[in-house]
Amino acid sequence: MPLISTLARLEAVRTGRAQPAATVLHRHLSARPLVLVPLTTAGEAGAPLGALVGTDRDAPRLLVVPQPADRELRFTFLARLASVVLPYIEEYAAQVEPAERTEADPETGKRVKVVTELCADAPQLVVPGRAGIELVRLLGRANRFRRTAEEEPEGPYPAPEQVPLLGRWFTHLGERARVPGSSLLVAMTDLLARHWATGQSALEDQHLGALLAWIDPPAGDDGDRAARHAELARDEEGQLLCPPAGPATDPAFDNKLLAPAVERYDQARRALADAQDGESADRLLAATTAAERELRALVESRTRPTWDAVWRGIDLLRELPEGAHVTDRWTRDRWSFTAHRDRLAAGEPPQPRRDDAVTAAQKLATREREQARLDAQEALDDPLVMAGRRLAGEAFAAEVLDVRMTYTESKRPSPRPVLTVRTEDAPHAAPGTKVYRELDGRPQSAEVLAPEEVAEADPEAGAELAAGDGAGPGERLLLLRVLDRMGRGREPEEGSVPEKGDRICWTLFEHDQRGGPKLPDPEETPWTHGGPPEPPGALPGPATAPDPVTPEDLL
């Protein structure tokens, strides 16, 4: 854990209130997010029990599966969920704007700019916690290969028409959520924990009620007591006053309330199926409806507090100004959303169960690159985050004491000004290290010089630097040679070189991330990674033939 995060948590314990971990909002927050609060049944992974979903905080849509073991009722739930989610997504898919992007020319292989469509905005799905993201990913994996009655008329348990499409979108959102900095699918606990430091552990921060209790405790109470109350307080019936944010439910709720209600619903359904006449059928239908209504009330009692907590978290986040680089990351999300929309429109098959070697390598490289970019951009956007990097020796703020103009020894000399700077930080800046500062939205690099290099060209300046003239107690002098972003002429452009007295923050990490090496086509990978496809008629090798059964295989 970074030192500044540890200090913030200690301060939260001392004051009884969460401390800011950021001064700006580091994630995009849609003006109209779709909030999803799901519940699942204990004992079976991904078996839905119900959900609250919608974009209106005052009018959520309640979806319930009265008997989670009934496959038809599950499909009905998924179809209703699709009827809410897909129209929301299609609203954004229909609004496009022209945009330029760089692509490889198929004939020449050169990178050229082309004009294409980009969705003007993208949807945003907000769930209470990380377990909600995993459930979205699980629902996508379980449903994107479903066959509808139209596709497979004779197949058992055909899925409603929109369920496979919902699965494909959920799969895309779940995969995109693994990309650092993405905001298409976000967990409220992660958003709040990124912007506030509480007096509890990171694992305890996954409890939405406790996290909000630290950030915004009730009047006259402190975060520790309020969080403990949110985690443990129960009513006279033994039910938690602050239900879990889901998708898992509290065992006391399952055993005392849910299981008896489901049993009453099953009994009412069986009795209705055995009805002998119309009068008894009407009476039993009313009993079945009442049992279902009871189940709906139970599910709403567990999901509505979480629904309100998610919107309360959204209100807290909206009080923060948006970071400068958030729009850039959201544009990447828009490109991702547009690309998946185009794949669906082109009739491409669902995402495969397992990625091939090249696709997997590309995804890993993308996540590593985006993580480095996110770390750099958050520090550039937020002085509080940059302070943490300075404490870690990865950046330093320095005052320019002197500027000496030097030039390269080439036929066409270029400016290479040498700066003498004074800092109170302790950066890990050995001679030869590159450092960077932001200039007009782009990075300008410089190189840390050793005093000996300066002494060769200017003995007097080298002696002053070696003696530490100009540095007070706890201060350090550094020599920086500016390397780029000064124009093409002999004299640097105005404003491209720091002036004496300027105070500048330099970083030891790069601001932009370069792309990795070009990966081979899947057909050209070695046999250890899938390899070329076998030629037609090729005999299977011994590695693909089943082992013969021997007596040792039988007990």
Question: PLM features: residue spans?
Answer:
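Beta-strand-rich binding/interaction modules
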Residues: H428-E438
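C-terminal effector modules of nucleic-acid-centric enzymes and ribosome-associated factors
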Residues: R437-D440, S445-V448, E453-L555
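Flexible loop/turn segments at secondary-structure boundaries
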Residues: A42-A47, A131-V136, M405-S410, P427-H428, ...
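Metal-dependent DNA phosphodiester-chemistry modules and their immediately adjacent helices/loops
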Residues: V115-K256, E263
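Long, charged/polar, low-complexity intrinsically disordered N-terminal extensions
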Residues: M1-A122, A142-R176, P180-G181, L185-M188, ...
